[in-house]
């Protein structure tokens, strides 16, 4: 997932598109929640560490990417701008560096972003939880 694959319809509805690299996993007509995918696809700056390291991964890679996109939207800054691929691999993928969260941002929002970026995908929240927490933050005017 990356910003280039997010857009709006003429009616203003948000859409995610370009599913050329996605994988639908089904077993007996049901989606499988636990599966293994491998490969090094996508845009590095939004890529979860396990994808960049060519390890098995799950849907939690999209939670990581979404967290980076949320940070980019809130900061109006391209994440990891100016890093070479080698620097990115050393600092971000292997070193665990993440985008800086400004002190003035709501702490709940910062905590959510950090959870989305956790190096361990098992620690990352589900998309359902991310949506729920963002909804709570918006309704309580923590995010505006």
Residue ranges and their predicted role:
Residues 34-50:
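Conserved activation segment of eukaryotic-like protein kinases, specifically the C-terminal portion
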Residues 54-59:
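Activation segment
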Residues 62:
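Conserved catalytic-loop aspartate of Hanks-type protein kinases
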Residues 75-79:
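Structural helix C-cap motif within protein kinase domains
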Residues 104-117:
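Conserved C-terminal C-lobe helix
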Residues 118-129:
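A conserved short helix/loop substructure at the end of the activation segment
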